[in-house]
């Protein structure tokens, strides 16, 4: 088993912005005053996304890019690692998300597409039912997985 992968899932941003539902519980997200319009920010985010995909491919990383669903207007869709993880044994885990808006990012069509491409899906563990009990664990946005030593590390937060 390896600690890192040569395969990445990326979701192309259709509506990139800060998320008012999650800003209070995300240390990396800040509301800033900007002279840039939302459209300027979206164009910049998309440009940076495409540049990153190019760099990753140049390093022989296999990239699976999916378009966000525009009508959902998901500001965080670029971070699929919060709703899903893929494991070498063929297990896919779907995580419970605190923000109702973020729950619309969870997409079985992506998992089906990946399983028909080259990723073996043996089983899906769907923990999203825990949202009803207000229990959340937002994937690798909440925890760091040490895959070699089979450990997970996390800090306590409203989303872990």
Positions of PLM-derived features:
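The feature marks the mature, well-folded catalytic cores of soluble enzymes
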Residues: 1-160
């Amino acid at each position: 088993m390896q600690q890192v992968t040569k395969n990445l899932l990326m979701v192309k941003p259709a509506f990139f912005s800060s998320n008012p539902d999650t800003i209070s519980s995300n240390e990396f997200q800040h509301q800033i005053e900007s002279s840039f319009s939302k459209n300027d920010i979206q164009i910049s985010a998309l440009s940076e996304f495409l540049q990153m995909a190019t760099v990753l491919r140049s390093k022989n990383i296999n990239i699976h890019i999916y378009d966000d669903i525009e009508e959902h207007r998901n500001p965080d869709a670029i971070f699929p690692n919060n709703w899903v993880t893929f494991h070498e044994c063929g297990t896919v885990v779907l995580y419970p998300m605190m923000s109702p808006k973020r729950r619309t990012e969870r997409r079985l069509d992506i998992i089906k597409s990946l399983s028909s491409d080259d990723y073996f899906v043996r089983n899906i563990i769907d923990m999203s039912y825990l949202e009803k009990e207000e229990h959340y664990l937002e994937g690798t946005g909440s925890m760091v997985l040490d895959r070699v030593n089979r450990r997970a590390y996390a800090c306590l937060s409203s989303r872990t």
